[in-house]
Amino acid sequence: MKTLLLTLVVVTIVCLDLGYTMTCCNQQSSQPKTTTPCAESSCYKKTWKDNRGTIIERGCGCPNVKPGIDLMCCKTDECNN
């Protein structure tokens, strides 16, 4: 019985992947790709235009944005590249 209980606990931990940390891209505009581990369950990519051209900001979470800023939020590793 103890073996069965231990097996169920191990299977539950493996299935839930309790130690999983999401990875999001965090480079700005056309910089080389960089990533960061995130505590949040989503990544974002904000895009807007100013006098320098198109600006892209990437990171963890899904922030609120001002009008005129395009926001794309997603929930898989490096989905905001």
From Swiss-Prot:
Residues 1-21 form the signal peptide. It comes from the Eukaryota. CDD domains: TFP_snake_toxin. Disulfide bonds join 24-43, 38-60, 62-73, 74-79. It is found in: Secreted. SUPFAM superfamilies: Snake toxin-like. One of its GO terms (cellular component) is extracellular region. InterPro entries: Snake_3FTx (IPR003571), Snake_toxin-like_sf (IPR045860), Snake_toxin_con_site (IPR018354), Toxin_cobra-type (IPR054131). One of its GO terms (molecular function) is toxin activity. Belongs to the three-finger toxin family. Short-chain subfamily. Type I alpha-neurotoxin sub-subfamily. This is Short neurotoxin 1.
